[in-house]
């Protein structure tokens, strides 16, 4: 069975730490998301993985499909950084 390797960067940390993960192609991408979130100590249930171009990745596919569609360099963002609704106070 072939493996795919991802370099996943935590974008919410100014130091931009990253982890390199190698998983079998058939691994559900939800498992990759969960493992990466645990490695960075962020909540998996409220995190998203995006491409370097900012395109969100649907985790309901295999790691092999994600690798073929989006490549190996990805970013994980915790929910508090996703969509970022700010509070606007009018003067």
From Swiss-Prot:
A GO BP term here is: reticulophagy
Which residues, in ranges, are excised as the propeptide?
Answer: 84-91
Identify the domain of life. Answer: Eukaryota
Which UniProt key words apply to this protein? Cytoplasm, Isopeptide bond, Nucleus, Ubl conjugation, Ubl conjugation pathway
InterPro entries listed in its UniProt record: Ubiquitin-like_domsf (IPR029071), UFM1 (IPR005375)
Signal peptide (UniProt feature, chain positions): none
Q: Which CDD domains match?
A: Ubl_UFM1
After translation, the protein is modified as follows: UFM1 precursor is cleaved by UFSP1, promoting its maturation: processing of the C-terminal Ser-Cys dipeptide is required to expose its C-terminal conserved Gly residue.
One cellular component (GO) term of this entry: nucleus
* Cross-link Glycyl lysine isopeptide (Gly-Lys) (interchain with K-? in acceptor proteins) per UniProt, renumbered positions: 83
Residues annotated as transmembrane: none
Check the record and name the Pfam families matching this protein: Ufm1
Cross-link entry Glycyl lysine isopeptide (Lys-Gly) (interchain with G-Cter in UFM1), positions: 69
Localization, per the record, is:
Nucleus; Cytoplasm
Give a short account of what the protein does.
Ubiquitin-like modifier which can be covalently attached via an isopeptide bond to lysine residues of substrate proteins as a monomer or a lysine-linked polymer. The so-called ufmylation, requires the ufm1-activating E1 enzyme uba5, the ufm1-conjugating E2 enzyme ufc1, and the ufm1-ligase E3 enzyme ufl1. Ufmylation is involved in various processes, such as ribosome recycling, response to DNA damage, transcription or reticulophagy (also called ER-phagy) induced in response to endoplasmic reticulum stress.
User: How does this polypeptide assemble, per the annotation?
Assistant: Interacts with uba5. Interacts with ufc1.
Task: Please give the family membership noted in the entry.
Answer: Belongs to the UFM1 family.
Please report the name of this protein according to its UniProt entry.
Ubiquitin-fold modifier 1
Q: Which organism is it from?
A: Osmerus mordax (Rainbow smelt)
């Amino acid at each position: 069975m072939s493996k795919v390797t991802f370099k996943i960067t935590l974008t919410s940390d100014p130091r931009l730490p990253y982890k390199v993960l190698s998983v079998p192609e058939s691994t559900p991408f939800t498992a990759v998301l969960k493992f990466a979130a645990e490695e960075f100590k962020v909540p998996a249930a409220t995190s998203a993985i995006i491409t370097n171009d900012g395109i969100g990745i649907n985790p309901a596919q295999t790691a092999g499909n994600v690798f073929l569609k989006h490549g190996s360099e990805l970013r994980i963002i915790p929910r508090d950084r996703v969509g970022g609704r700010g509070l606007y106070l009018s003067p």
